[in-house]
Amino acid sequence: MVNKAVCVLKGTGEVTGTVYFNQEGEKKPVKVTGEITGLTPGKHGFHVHAFGDNTNGCISAGPHFNPHDKTHGGPTDSVRHVGDLGNVTADASGVAKIEIEDAMLTLSGQHSIIGRTMVIHEKEDDLGKGGNEESLKTGNAGGRLACGVIGITQ
């Protein structure tokens, strides 16, 4: 079983980061840690997208990873995309420290996030509560600032 992964985030602007994934066992939650720099202060949507394709920048990563065909939600909602990790918050200097534990993510099996793309978005994710169609798809999180493919590590 794969139990560690990493993702290096890069975009067309100043936003960069490194995100680590650790899963102690098959039925255990995935711990997501890391740091993203170059952000505007405040909340930014943070999602795993369906494809590991960054040939056309972050746009070719496709929609949020959603193998169960659910609507968009927050990380604590029972109805959500597997890739819905909510928001990360950048401080006044534009740095977001990531510390998330998520029971829906997995690093192995049919719905593994390995080979998919992690994306940091321009705006705050409304967690599917924005009252419009786009909210139920993307959380109205806006453009894709930086992304990277999630890969196996030691």
Swiss-Prot record:
It catalyses: 2 superoxide + 2 H(+) = H2O2 + O2. Its cofactor is Cu cation; Zn(2+). A lipid is attached at residue 7 (S-palmitoyl cysteine). Pfam families: Sod_Cu (PF00080). It is found in: Cytoplasm; Nucleus. The keyword Disulfide bond applies. GO terms for cellular component: cytosol; mitochondrion; nucleus; peroxisome. It comes from the Eukaryota. GO terms for molecular function: copper ion binding; superoxide dismutase activity. Its main location: cytoplasm. Zn(2+) binds at residues 64, 72, 81, 84. Cu cation binds at residues 47, 49, 64, 121. PANTHER family: SUPEROXIDE DISMUTASE CU-ZN -RELATED (PTHR10003). Destroys radicals which are normally produced within the cells and which are toxic to biological systems. This is Superoxide dismutase [Cu-Zn]. The lineage of its organism: Eukaryota, Metazoa, Chordata, Craniata, Vertebrata. The gene is sod1.
